[in-house]
Amino acid sequence: LRTKARKDGDDWIITGNKTWITHAARTHVMTVLARSVEGTTDYRGLSMFLAEKTPGTDATPFVDQGLSGGEIEVLGYRGMREYALQFDGMKAPADALLGGEEGQGFKQLMRTVEGARIQTAARAVGVARRAIELAFQYALDRKQFGQSIIRFPRVADKLAKMVTDMVMARELTYAA
């Protein structure tokens, strides 16, 4: 993690990058994990900040000084926009430090990861399901030797394996 936060009077100055911020352009507040404890290289030097920002628009997503970025093209995130951000001296007030104590950011982050992993699994199952639907339709529509290719054992077997794998993934996601 290369993003850093340093204290400057009553503010934190944040520099570095962050990737995978959902709805970053429109949000009023975002979480930022940054190294704030000087001389550390492991998780103990990381702190979490609740950084306020001015909501942007599609044309001008980031208007605050010290903050820029762009949208990331992603698969299966319909209706959710993901961004990569660059912090170039973005200011956050002293009370933006989540929990008020430096070095707790990694622990705070890990408490949120489990839910995010389940959400990612659910999204992947949805993408797989749609891919299977399209594959079935293609196998029905595509003719070879006067018949739909779904009638060929190798094609039917591959489609059956895809369905089996997707159902297993779905059930594991439900159980998570």
Residue ranges and their predicted role:
Residues L1, H28, G45, R81-Y83:
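Residues that flank catalytic or metal-binding motifs in active/ligand-binding sites
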Residues T3-R6:
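A structural signal for short hydrophobic beta-strand segments in well-ordered beta-sheet cores
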Residues D8-D10, R35-G39, K53-G56, D88-D95:
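Short loop segments at secondary-structure junctions
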Residues G9-I13, V29, E82:
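A generic structural signal for beta-strand entry/edge sites
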Residues T15-Q65:
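A short core secondary-structure module
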Residues Q65-V167:
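Glycine-rich beta->alpha junctions and the first turn(s) of the following alpha-helix
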